[in-house]
């Protein structure tokens, strides 16, 4: 009996001591205390960066507008981190005299979510297959890309005879 009473008496003494103390300020772990654990904030809602890296292959249609300006439309497909398999359209305007262009990327994921970006780029036209470097700023999207931001670089090769392009993309998407 004595071994049973000792823990009960110790627990009662501990409880009485805890209850006799005056209330303290809420801790950061208390509900509603403004801490992050229980304050209603969610890590899923906090902006976070994800890597964006992939490859693309496609066809190119070039239409003269008012030389040296040409409308160029790329229709491509590929695969990238976080996006998965995608289709891609890239309408843009190119000044063939300066080898500079500007336009938009629209990636469509397999589930229909879209990621959009605006870019500027330059081409090295000194060889039969042009080397093109583009820098893009992500402007948003739909589905899981709604409100997305970030940036990426595209490095492509364009064969003007075959009217094809291949390339890589690499950067980050900031999910909001």
Predicted regions and their residues:
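Intrinsically disordered, low-complexity proline-rich regions
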Residues: 4, 20-23
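Flanking scaffold residues of small Cys/His-coordinated metal-binding clusters
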Residues: 11
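Beta-strand-enriched cores of mature, soluble protein domains
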Residues: 22-176
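C-terminal motif of bacterial Sec signal peptides marking the signal peptidase cleavage site
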Residues: 15-18
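Bacterial N-terminal signal peptides that target proteins for export
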Residues: 1-8
């Amino acid at each position: 009996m004595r071994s049973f009473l000792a823990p009960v008496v110790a627990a009662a003494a501990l409880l009485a001591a805890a209850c006799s103390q005056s209330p303290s300020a809420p801790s950061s772990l208390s509900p509603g205390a403004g801490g992050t654990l229980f304050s209603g904030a969610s890590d899923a809602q906090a902006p976070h960066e994800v890597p964006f890296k992939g490859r693309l292959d496609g066809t190119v249609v070039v239409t003269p507008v008012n030389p040296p300006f040409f409308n160029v439309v790329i229709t491509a497909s590929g695969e990238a981190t976080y996006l998965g398999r995608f289709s891609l359209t890239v309408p843009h305007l190119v000044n063939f005299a300066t080898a500079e262009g500007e336009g938009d990327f629209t990636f469509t994921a397999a589930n229909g979510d879209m990621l959009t970006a605006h870019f500027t780029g330059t081409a090295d036209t000194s060889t039969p297959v042009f080397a093109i470097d583009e820098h893009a700023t992500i402007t948003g999207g739909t589905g899981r890309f709604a409100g997305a931001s970030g940036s990426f670089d595209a490095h492509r090769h364009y064969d003007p005879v075959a009217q094809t392009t291949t390339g890589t993309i690499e950067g980050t998407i900031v999910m909001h």
